[in-house]
Amino acid sequence: MRVGFVFALLVVSVIVCFNGLTSAESTVVMNNRNPDSINVPISDDITSRNLRASGEERAYAFVDKIKSLFSRPGISQKVESLQKNPAMVKNLEKAALSQKGSSKVRDWFMHMYNNSSKRDKFFILATLVMFPIGVWAVVTNYRR
């Protein structure tokens, strides 16, 4: 039961934290494409409004994002070229593990640190501290 609870908690956390599924702001323009409801008259003065499933803003944006990800021809061509050329993959691995690459990552983190507010820094630090504690708690409870 504990494993199922941890898995359910993980799924709920991922869904809540995924901004594309939880926000409807990016799809306001997309709603003009198709009508979002059908007005059905019940009587002379009452009209029932039935929403269509395609009118749901959040799910519609999520589906469009997934479709656009798979419809980009550049990504599949790059993956195919990397699969054909293993030397290029090794060069990418060397560049990622070299000191030059790590200094760029370090510079990026310093830039993000310098441009974030105290509240953002607090939540980042709290997340970094609480994650290992949470992993430890799950592992110790799983062993019982």
From Swiss-Prot:
Induction text: Expression is induced during host plant infection.
Species: Phytophthora infestans (strain T30-4) (Potato late blight agent)
Domain of life: Eukaryota
Disulfide bonds, paired cysteine numbers: none
Gene this protein is translated from: PexRD28
Subunit structure and binding partners: Interacts with the C-terminal portions the ER-associated potato NAC transcription factors NTP1 and NTP2.
Signal peptide: 1-24
Domain remark in the UniProt entry: The RxLR-dEER motif acts to carry the protein into the host cell cytoplasm through binding to cell surface phosphatidylinositol-3-phosphate.
Protein name per UniProt: RxLR effector protein PITG_03192
Record key words, sorted: Glycoprotein, Host endoplasmic reticulum, Host membrane, Membrane, Secreted, Signal, Transmembrane, Transmembrane helix, Virulence
Location of the motif RxLR-dEER: 49-58
Transmembrane residue ranges: 122-142
Job description of the protein: Effector that is required for full virulence. Targets host NTP1 and NTP2 transcription factors and prevents their pathogen-associated molecular pattern (PAMP)-triggered re-localization from the endoplasmic reticulum into the nucleus, where they contribute to prevent disease progression by P.infestans.
Subcellular location: Secreted; Host endoplasmic reticulum membrane
GO cellular component: extracellular region; host cell endoplasmic reticulum membrane; membrane
Bilayer disposition of the protein: Single-pass membrane protein
Single Gene Ontology BP annotation: symbiont-mediated perturbation of host transcription
Family per similarity comment: Belongs to the RxLR effector family.
Phenotype reported upon loss of the gene: Decreases virulence on both potato and Nicitiana benthamiana.
Glycan-linked positions: 115
